[in-house]
Swiss-Prot record:
Residue ranges with Pro residues bias: 395-411
EC main group: transferase
CDD domains per record: STKc_PknB_like (cd14014)
Keyword Coiled coil attributed: no
Keywords: ATP-binding, Kinase, Nucleotide-binding, Serine/threonine-protein kinase, Transferase
Keyword Repeat listed: no
Enzyme Commission identifier(s): 2.7.11.1
SMART domains in the cross-refs: S_TKc (SM00220)
Residue intervals passing through the bilayer: none
Residues given in the record as ATP binding sites: V26, G27, H28, G29, G30, M31, S32, T33, V34, K49
Stated name of the protein: Serine/threonine-protein kinases drp72
Region feature Disordered, mapped onto this chain: 315-334, 366-504
Family label: Belongs to the protein kinase superfamily. Ser/Thr protein kinase family.
Length: 520
């Protein structure tokens, strides 16, 4: 950390006060920065999410930041990142300085996991869905709608526990929107049809978004893509999702199909109904229909299962390395070591010894060989991560009966270390099958009627919000990626925001929207 950074950190520390001691930055979001800090009062690590100075005088951003703290402060669930504190102080220039103190989660955001793994095994994907649905059930019982459920705002700890973060655009179901009438806030890839049109959002809107996440986990791709946020949103409004791979069970496909119904009244009503339905599918049953007695009883939070433990093994803590290496946690220094390095060294030594023995046997060093022998080059590519993938070195042991042109035949291949990375599933063209959803009505060109489109669309494409990009074991407090990282993602350590969708705030007029739709 250079002098300028030290000075900036010192000024920030003075504003925060003595209760929290800043360590280093673990995540960045669209409107905030997340620090790992020590809670000196309660003797614990926390994620401190600081609103960026350039937004502190912006009424809309300040309202969102306050809303995030207030919306989450009374939510207590194992599957929701905990908010500990919120403060506003005036800086020397008279500007408002705001920060939220959140639970610091060591782990990884679901967004980072999906980027690395592709599709997840069905049991793991359903485990994630059930845990997330339980978190949503608590949020919905508090009368809130999250409005931005996506992989970047879902953090997974080393124990396989999923936590929802980033309440920056959450709202009470009966309250007025944070933004002006006709404006949409959310992430286009996961937005519900009613939210995309600027209509009233309900808990069923969060169910739809989680259904999109489930589709992505099981299929290895999102149901709708496009060259702009608006084109993706229009697809959510008008198009039926593509068939899922036939490798996914019929029960799981039916579950996702119900969650992705265009009409919110035909979906599961809230997180509780969805949790009950996922539980039934995990037992091998068909999902119960929405609003039926089977899904209206209060869902019981699942006990950690074998799949939960496996999920924790798949989750890989991603750490945002501080500028000064002297403050790195000791456990991070061990990440590059292990059996893999030992096997690599052993393989290289074996190859060298084998080459020497073979050379002696064939007379390469004796001077009586008339041929020029070019030793085989052994190439080993090593990537210092837990999922190291390297080319297997070819070992050339001495042949039993060497000839003048020996051709070494490998007879031993170093054992590869097991890795949690799974092969990308083979794309299987699904056979046509009936869906429970009739074709949606569209206008010519696939565009929704003018009356269904909001005056403008404002997409917050932050796949992780502000997450705490955390240390190993982080769900991040990127894995608090907002709370990124914590509320926004306690993500890779509360950095809920390192995701493919991190990004831009887009405001588009109706004319621009029509142009985009017409050019598709």
């Amino acid at each position: 950390m250079n002098t300028a950074d030290d000075n900036a950190k010192q000024r920030l520390q003075e504003l925060i006060g003595p209760d929290y001691t800043l360590q280093w930055i673990v995540g960045h979001g669209g409107m905030s920065t997340v620090w790992l800090a020590d809670d000196n009062v309660n003797d614990r690590e926390v994620a401190v999410k600081v609103l960026r100075p350039e937004f502190s005088d912006n009424t809309e951003f300040l309202s969102r930041f306050r809303n995030e703290a207030r919306a989450a402060e009374n939510i207590h669930s194992e599957h929701v990142v905990t908010t500990y504190d919120y403060r506003e102080v005036a800086d020397p220039a008279g500007h408002t300085f705001c920060f939220i103190v959140l639970e610091y989660i060591r782990g990884e955001s679901l967004a980072d996991m999906l980027e690395r793994e592709g599709a997840l095994p069905e049991e793991l994907a359903l485990d994630v869905m059930e845990q997330a649905a339980h978190g949503l059930s608590v949020i919905h019982r508090m009368g809130l709608v999250h409005r931005d459920i996506k992989p970047g705002n879902m953090l997974i700890t080393a124990n396989g526990i999923l936590k929802i973060t980033d309440f920056g655009i959450a709202k009470a179901a009966a309250s007025v929107p944070l933004t002006r009438t006709g404006m949409v806030v959310g992430t286009a890839q996961y937005v519900s049809p009613e939210q995309a049109q600027g209509h009233q959002v309900t808990p069923a809107s969060d169910v739809y978004s989680l259904g999109v996440v489930g589709y992505e986990m099981l299929s290895g791709r999102r149901p709708f893509t496009g060259d702009s946020s608006v084109s993706v949103a229009i697809a959510h409004i008008n198009e039926a999702p593509p068939q899922m791979p036939t490798s996914v069970s019929a029960q799981a496909r039916e579950l996702i199909g119900i969650a992705l119904r265009k009409d919110p009244a035909r979906r599961f009503a809230d997180g509780n109904e969805l949790a009950r339905a996922v539980s039934a599918v995990r037992l091998g049953n068909r999902p119960p229909q929405p609003h039926s007695p089977a899904v209206q009883a209060t869902a019981v939070a699942p006990s950690p299962s074998a799949s939960t433990a496996m999920l924790g093994q798949v989750a890989r803590p991603t750490t945002s390395v501080p500028a000064s290496p002297t403050v790195l946690p000791e456990r991070q220094e061990k990440r590059g070591s292990g059996v893999g390095l030992g096997l690599l060294i052993a393989a290289v030594i074996a190859a060298v010894i084998g080459g020497i023995i073979w050379a002696g046997a064939t007379g390469v060093f004796s001077g009586d060989s008339e041929e020029t022998t070019t030793p085989e080059t052994i190439t080993q590519t090593v990537t210092p991560t837990e999922t190291t993938t390297s080319e297997e070195p070819t070992l050339a042991p001495p042949p039993v009966q060497p000839t003048r042109q020996p051709v070494p035949t490998p007879d031993e291949t170093p054992t590869r270390l097991p890795t949690t990375t799974q092969e990308s599933p083979t794309r299987v063209s699904p056979t046509p099958e009936e869906t429970d959803e009739p074709g949606e009505q569209t206008t010519p060109g696939g565009q929704p009627p003018l009356s269904t489109l909001p005056t403008s669309l404002g997409w917050q494409n932050n796949q992780g919000g502000t997450g705490n990009q955390g240390n190993p074991n982080t769900t991040g407090n990127p894995a608090n990626p907002g709370t990124p990282g914590t509320t926004g993602g306690n993500g890779t350590g509360n950095a809920g925001g390192n995701s493919p969708d991190a990004a831009d705030e887009l405001l588009m007029s109706l004319d621009e929207l029509m142009n985009v739709g017409g050019n598709q």
